[in-house]
């Protein structure tokens, strides 16, 4: 009888535990709903900041190209040249004051999400990134809008997380949502915006992060579509070539080999020149003078190659040249110009210059195919789109983002299948060539820079998700990596002593670790708390 009473009491406790846990999980679902709503607000704010950024870049490019197209008298070039030089010197001064606004912004965003970097003054830095990116672009440099848009979005996510008092473990979701919304605002591609967060920034798939990023991306993409109702990439006419299966595979294999080798050269040159540029002891104003001189000479020859070269790419895709040598010369010129521009460290991304180089490389391969009768002239734009996706895979090493982005922004689903085939081959070839993703190289250069302020220990905040590995575990029973420890558990507005605490869904857990381990441990620790 006594045994029966004990069993009954135990069963009652189990039922009560399940009931309490059920109510707790139900309450967490309401908290998640709040987070999803806030992420949509982040997407809206990011769109309201990043879309005007895109519009101003578009406006200033056409203002600049109109000036050069009018062939003004020689003396009008002097004030524009000096003004452009002064602009870049000012932007370089801004970067010196706030190093995080330099470059594209994707490596910085990754650093903030994994806890290595902190946005101490997000609003001031966001405004500086906005202004610095516009001024650098207006000077004619070969820089893209996507990196700054991503970082602007992460700044918005940081600000909103402060305003709404979001829990520590959820802040990274808003940062990721803002980053994805930034890319969606730059290209009106919400699906690709979620994928770039998964592949290049977070580097793994946490369900809540994916949902918040997609929601924010859809809202930001809607804002972009209102301001830019006509996507210029939709104007590209594509005709799919008709050839036998084995001929098609052979052609795609050749394209994959060419793009892989060129991608290796592109990445290696970018990395090498960035290190050489950093070691040059000339004053910043002298470096900016050389940069403006190169940009101005190219503007006089082919103004559409400035500003990343996107307008030149669109023109070639719609009604391009048939001269192989001329296109090759222009591609090499654009490549050298992009290397100079990106290596300067000025605010601006390398995504669009990479996209343009890939498109022009595809045009060359397509024209060679026309010359040998493999495809027709009307099929060249088709090869260009496939090559754009392929070159992004080779350089950035984000195959899903590259394939979906090109399909999404062009609306041509007929390039999806060849992009998957060529992209898969290239991903394998780049593994053989031991190519490191460009954003990873930029991130490593950033955290190993002499002026980078590094702490000895970092704290990672994670949220325990329902049915994750850490759900229900006693802190004392966990075998964490060496010199890695849980220092606090935040639950229902209270801080609990970790020892003896059983983790439950919704707990905000702070894990302290050495600085050299944060990149290695971020993914496994967050996965243990988030993935189910």
Regions found by a protein language model. Give the residues of each.
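Short, compositionally biased
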Residues: 521-532
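Short, solvent-exposed amphipathic alpha-helical segments in soluble enzyme
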Residues: 409, 478-480, 526-527
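Alpha-helical transmembrane segments and immediately membrane-proximal extracytoplasmic
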Residues: 1-447, 456, 465-466, 490-493, ...
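Cytosolic Rossmann-like ligand/nucleotide-binding regulatory domains
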Residues: 466, 470-517, 521
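Short, low-complexity disordered segments enriched in Ser/Pro/Gly and basic
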Residues: 452-458
